[in-house]
UniProtKB/Swiss-Prot annotation:
Localization in the cell: Golgi apparatus membrane
Keywords from the named record: Disulfide bond, Glycoprotein, Golgi apparatus, Membrane, Signal-anchor, Transferase, Transmembrane, Transmembrane helix
Residues noted as binding 3'-phosphoadenylyl sulfate in the record, renumbered to the chain: 147-151, 228, 236, 353-357
Name assigned to this protein: Heparan sulfate glucosamine 3-O-sulfotransferase 3B1
Organism field: Homo sapiens (Human)
Stretch list, region Disordered: 1-25, 74-133
Enzyme class per UniProt: transferase
Compositionally biased residues, Low complexity: 123-133
Length: 390
């Protein structure tokens, strides 16, 4: 012990090169590649997760009609933007719906019109990119008609990846115009380049101020009107009101001013809404007929894919919604989409769709058809389309 070797070094003095060396740190390139690979794995996982609820289930299974949105849609329009919303430079006067008289006495405006039905529901992929896109004023609006099939048309269109629509009825151009366009825009869903923003409020078609107001927003707005046999539409309208207020008078008593003389009471909105030619005249003062598409409510039942093809063409969209998206629900008697938007499960519109209509006296129906016939013929001429109601 303590003996020194030649050269004056202790036996414990071992050359450093004989000791094990720590591994060299990985070069920066390896770290970057590892981080990039990890990020790619996370992105791929999120993409596949999103597609599981969206790519495999584009269409939505919904019945025809204009009722409330399917229950799976989450709320999105409950609040207005923070702070005081910008307003138009004037206080807009109350809109003047052409419906009046008995309708006001009955309080027949349904809850579906009075409050938002169900707000917009983004698909899983759009939720993943919720920070993307921007809110735009609508480029297309379904303006009517009540009980014509507007809800079904909107839900069918929402299957299309290039259509983004607000689920509730905004009622901006008839009830909330004084809140301003900034408030209206904030109700809309976010869209990406190439997507169309839409909304539907059937009461616009019978509101005198609506054509000028929409034109002031944009003269290029595309307008869609879903129309239906006015007699059937009136009975459906009455049936909806009856379900809310069972104590209202009979359809027959509301239809006539004087049944003996056969005078139809056009102050009742259920009758007045069906005078399509009269309402269309107001719209043609502000929009050319080429900017309006008239969809047959009857064909939405008998040939939904065909009617949706016309709508997609009108909106400049690729024909993605086709026959393969639909099946016929024998219980309800309506076509449905095979899969709901953002879901792999079938779903039809609510229980209020396909209500059984009350029995109406055949003589009343005959007189109503006689009343509507000249208006229908004029409507056919104005639109260039025979809807075959007579």
């Amino acid at each position: 012990m303590g003996q020194r070797l030649s050269g004056g070094r202790s036996c414990l003095d071992v050359p450093g090169r004989l000791l094990p060396q720590p591994p060299p740190p990985p070069p920066p390139v390896r770290r970057k590649l590892a981080l990039l690979f990890a990020m790619l794995c996370v992105w791929l996982y999120m993409f596949l997760y999103s597609c599981a609820g969206s790519c495999a289930a584009a269409p939505g299974l919904l019945l025809l009609g204009s009722g409330s949105r399917a229950a799976h849609d989450p709320p999105a329009l409950a609040t207005a933007p923070d702070g005081t919303p910008p307003r138009l430079p004037f206080r807009a006067p109350p809109a003047t719906p052409l419906a009046s008289g008995k309708e006001m006495a009955e309080g027949a405006a349904s809850p579906e019109e009075q409050s938002p039905e169900v707000p917009d529901s983004p698909s899983p992929i759009s939720s993943f990119f919720s920070g993307s896109g921007s809110k735009q004023l609508p480029q297309a609006i379904i303006i009517g008609v009540k009980k014509g099939g507007t809800r079904a048309l909107l839900e069918f269109l929402r299957v299309h990846p290039d259509v983004r629509a607000v689920g509730a009825e905004p009622h901006f151009f008839d009830r909330s115009y004084d809140k301003g366009l900034a408030w209206y825009r904030d109700l809309m869903p976010r869209t990406l380049d190439g997507q169309i923003t839409m909304e539907k409020t059937p009461s616009y078609f019978v509101t005198r101020e609506a054509p000028a107001r929409i034109s002031a927003m944009s003269k290029d707005t595309k307008l869609i009107v879903v129309v239906r046999d006015p007699v059937t539409r009136a009975i459906s309208d009455y049936t909806q009101t009856l379900s809310k207020r069972p104590d209202i008078p009979t359809f027959e008593s509301l239809t006539f001013k004087n049944r003996t003389a056969g005078l139809i009471d056009t102050s009742w909105s259920a009758i007045q809404i069906g005078i399509y030619a009269k309402h269309l005249e107001h719209w043609l003062r502000h929009f050319p007929i080429r900017q309006m598409l008239f969809v047959s409510g009857e064909r939405l039942i008998s040939d939904p894919a065909g009617e949706l093809g016309r709508v997609q063409d009108f909106l400049g969209l690729k024909r993605i919604i086709t026959d393969k998206h639909f099946y016929f629900n024998k219980t309800k008697g309506f076509p449905c989409l095979k899969k709901a938007e953002g879901s792999s499960r079938p779903h039809c519109l609510g229980k209020t769709k396909g209500r059984t209509h009350p029995e109406i006296d055949r003589e009343v129906v005959r007189r109503l058809r006689e009343f509507y016939r000249p208006f229908n013929l004029k409507f056919y001429q104005m639109t260039g389309h025979d809807f075959g109601w007579d």
